[in-house]
């Protein structure tokens, strides 16, 4: 019925018994313990009875034995009490283990159910992708023939295609490209061949042809050559569309961009057009012979845009998605830093950054299939160009639709770039000296001698800065205040010596919003004028959730290339790789159907081309409702970031940079537990956080003010820095500079 306690095994835990049996066993154990406690009391009563026969015959030896029995019984009672306490502790322990096991079982069941739901969702997504890949082209009914063109001139990014009757009216145009040789487009048409749509398109084309017989007396001779020349030039342009079965994007199972990559593809098209104009100076409409060469510049450009996760394919979909995630990560990181600084200034503690960072990184990974806006893709491409380190090409994305000429001069003029690096070197040296001053101040404060070293070092530093003073540069103040401990990350001498002394070519992408919900009709004529400019690259935009690459116009119809066509992913080393990126059939739509959000592109080969673009834009702006403005100087409140590498545009970064630049006098707002990536300059400084430093420094400064003159005090406290350029910090949430971006592959 009951098993006694053993030092080796203990009481039986009763886990194998039913609940009632377990309670009965516990009750029996407690009853046995009560009986054992009452037993010594009965024995003592027997010895103490006065009439007992043993009491009369007791001796000293018997009393000693009786005392020993009392001690033994007391020890037995203590042991029993300890055994009871240990038994109760074991019961509590077993109950806790049982609860933990139950919670673990529930957690495993929950994870299993979540995994099943995830698998079902993945199966649904994969099935949806396969269905979309199989029927998307049929659903879109991609045309197999070009649209009908009227006898009016056709404009294609500064080129005019017109009939013989209109030549006399367009001789003054230097960009006119007459076409006299008809060209067959069987190859391009064969890509989109569809039996169902082919007959319908042929019938519609024949009906339109019969209806216009009376108006084609003169045009029948010249229009086929004009249209064929225009279509031939369009077919030679690089065309990107949806792809399927490419290698999965990092940390995902996504192998196609159907439904979400149209803006990404149009951004690739306008950038590829700029690169072709940059590499082919004489004729940017690359002939077919050049396109077939395996080691030509054309093949090199196509390799840059291949959909494979490799560093060689710098403008591929994997790199663009990776850059987008890096930008989102950077924005979230700056937000966390801003929240931490605000909470510390208010007297609060540090936030739980680790958990928030993990949750936000999961959200970033889930946003791979997010549709990009024109502004976003423009800034992503700009940073990819910057990462490629092309020595003779820059990209500029203004934030307010204004081109600042002095800023472009600093960006594209290599002599100014040389001075720019010299200024940065001087500022870095100056900041290191100021940091050493602050460290010496802290040591002297601890030794109760804070005055002498600070004054002499600061004076020497200010004199060195006066001797090495450089002309002002429009570099944002936050960047000048950063300190880089690892100088091996950038070799100034090598970079400066490798820069050729000439003007860099320039790609300009200007994001615009030309209306609220739909395009304002007053801007249509301005868009036509911009498409006529010789520096034009067209513009990207389109309808809501549908992006197109607009390359020209005729009358009130805008001509565009459509990326909504699914093709197989092709290995860049295959023989027919280039064929899948050409042969696009242009389409037309009314200007009134355009979405107001778009991004206009220009390419300037040299300084003369840039000045010509500014002059032409100034003439266009003389009319009402200007779209793009040109200014000579960058205003003080404006910050442009194309000159600055590793610069994060946020109020927190600027505040922390100013704190470091001021010798750490305000780094009470910088917590010790701020954990950021290795690229953040806060980690490089390793600033110790001591909330008492501020008070000690203030007391020491007050003592110095009483002993020294005001001039010396001002010289100690005020470092000699360039004037602050911005009076307020604009919001660059869509234009974040990335300092922790690494290429995929």
UniProtKB/Swiss-Prot annotation:
Matching InterPro entries: Papain-like_cys_pep_sf (IPR038765), Peptidase_C54 (IPR005078), Peptidase_C54_cat (IPR046792)
Keyword Phosphoprotein in record: no
Catalytic site: 262, 562, 564
Keywords assigned: Autophagy, Cytoplasm, Hydrolase, Protease, Protein transport, Thiol protease, Transport, Ubl conjugation pathway
Recorded family membership: Belongs to the peptidase C54 family.
Job description of the protein: Cysteine protease that plays a key role in autophagy by mediating both proteolytic activation and delipidation of ATG8 family proteins. The protease activity is required for proteolytic activation of ATG8 family proteins: cleaves the C-terminal amino acid of ATG8 proteins to reveal a C-terminal glycine. Exposure of the glycine at the C-terminus is essential for ATG8 proteins conjugation to phosphatidylethanolamine (PE) and insertion to membranes, which is necessary for autophagy. In addition to the protease activity, also mediates delipidation of PE-conjugated ATG8 proteins.
Protein name as catalogued: Cysteine protease atg4
Protein encoded by which gene: atg4-1
């Amino acid at each position: 019925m009951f098993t006694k306690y053993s030092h080796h095994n203990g009481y039986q835990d009763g886990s194998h018994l039913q609940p009632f049996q377990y309670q009965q066993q516990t009750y029996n154990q407690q009853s046995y313990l009560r009986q054992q406690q009452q037993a010594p009391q009965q024995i003592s009563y027997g010895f103490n009875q006065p009439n007992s026969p043993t009491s009369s015959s007791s001796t000293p030896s018997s009393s000693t034995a009786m005392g020993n029995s009392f001690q033994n019984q007391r020890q037995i009672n203590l042991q029993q009490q300890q055994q009871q306490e240990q038994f109760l502790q074991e019961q509590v322990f077993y109950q806790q283990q049982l609860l933990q096991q139950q919670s673990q079982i529930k957690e495993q069941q929950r994870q299993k159910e979540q995994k099943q739901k995830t698998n079902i969702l993945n199966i649904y997504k994969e099935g949806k992708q396969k269905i979309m890949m199989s029927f998307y082209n049929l659903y879109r009914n991609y045309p197999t023939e070009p649209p009908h063109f009227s006898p009016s001139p056709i404009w294609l990014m500064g080129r005019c295609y017109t009939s013989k009757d209109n030549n006399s009216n367009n001789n003054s145009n230097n960009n006119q490209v007459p076409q006299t040789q008809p060209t067959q487009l069987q190859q391009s048409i064969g890509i989109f061949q569809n039996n169902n749509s082919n007959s319908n398109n042929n019938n519609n084309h024949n009906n339109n042809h019969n209806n216009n017989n009376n108006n084609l007396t003169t045009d029948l001779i010249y229009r086929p050559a004009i249209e064929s020349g225009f279509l031939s030039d369009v077919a030679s342009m690089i065309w990107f569309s949806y792809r399927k079965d490419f290698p999965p994007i990092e940390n995902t199972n996504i192998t196609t961009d159907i439904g979400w990559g149209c803006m990404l593809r149009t951004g690739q098209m306008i950038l590829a057009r700029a690169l072709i104009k940059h590499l082919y100076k004489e004729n940017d409409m690359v002939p077919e012979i050049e396109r077939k060469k395996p080691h030509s510049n054309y093949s090199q450009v196509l390799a840059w845009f291949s959909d494979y996760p490799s560093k060689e394919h710098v403008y591929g979909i994997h790199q663009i998605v990776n850059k987008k995630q890096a930008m989102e990560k950077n924005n979230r990181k700056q937000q966390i830093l801003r929240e931490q600084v605000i909470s510390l200034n208010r007297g609060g503690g540090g936030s739980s950054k680790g958990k928030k960072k993990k949750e936000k990184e999961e959200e970033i990974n889930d946003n791979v299939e997010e549709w990009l806006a024109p502004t976003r893709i423009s800034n992503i491409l700009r940073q990819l160009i910057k990462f490629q380190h092309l020595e003779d090409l820059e990209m500029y994305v203004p934030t307010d639709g204004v081109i600042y000429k002095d800023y472009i001069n600093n960006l594209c003029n290599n002599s100014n770039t040389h001075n720019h690096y010299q200024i940065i070197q001087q500022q870095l040296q100056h900041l290191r000296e100021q940091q050493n001053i602050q460290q010496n101040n802290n040591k002297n404060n601890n030794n109760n001698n804070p005055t002498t070293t600070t004054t002499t070092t600061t004076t020497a530093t200010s004199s060195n800065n006066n001797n090495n003073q450089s002309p002002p540069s429009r570099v944002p103040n936050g960047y000048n205040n950063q300190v880089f401990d690892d100088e091996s990350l950038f070799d100034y001498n090598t970079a400066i010596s490798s820069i050729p002394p000439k003007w860099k070519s320039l790609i300009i992408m200007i994001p615009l919003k030309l209306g609220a919900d739909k395009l304002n009709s007053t801007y249509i004529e301005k868009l036509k004028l911009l498409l006529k400019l010789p520096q034009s690259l067209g513009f990207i935009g389109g309808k809501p959730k549908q992006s197109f690459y607009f390359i020209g116009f005729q009358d009130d119809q805008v001509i565009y290339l459509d990326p909504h066509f699914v093709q197989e992913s092709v290995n860049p080393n295959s023989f027919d790789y280039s064929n899948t990126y050409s042969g696009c059939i242009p389409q037309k739509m009314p200007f009134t159907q355009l979405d107001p959000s778009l991004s206009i592109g220009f390419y300037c080969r040299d300084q003369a081309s840039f000045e010509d673009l500014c002059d032409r834009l100034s003439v266009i702006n003389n009319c009402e409702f200007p779209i793009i403005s040109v200014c000579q100087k960058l205003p003080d409140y404006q910050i442009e970031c194309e000159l600055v590498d590793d610069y994060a545009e946020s109020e927190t970064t600027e505040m922390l940079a100013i704190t470091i630049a001021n010798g750490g006098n305000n780094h009470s707002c910088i917590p010790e537990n701020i954990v950021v990536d290795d690229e953040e300059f806060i980690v490089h400084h390793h600033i110790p956080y001591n909330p008492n430093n501020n008070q000690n420094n203030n007391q020491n400064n007050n003592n110095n003010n009483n002993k020294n003159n005001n001039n010396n005090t001002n010289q100690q406290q005020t470092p000699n820095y360039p004037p602050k350029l911005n009076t307020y910090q604009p919001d660059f949430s869509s234009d974040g500079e990335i300092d922790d971006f690494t290429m995929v592959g």
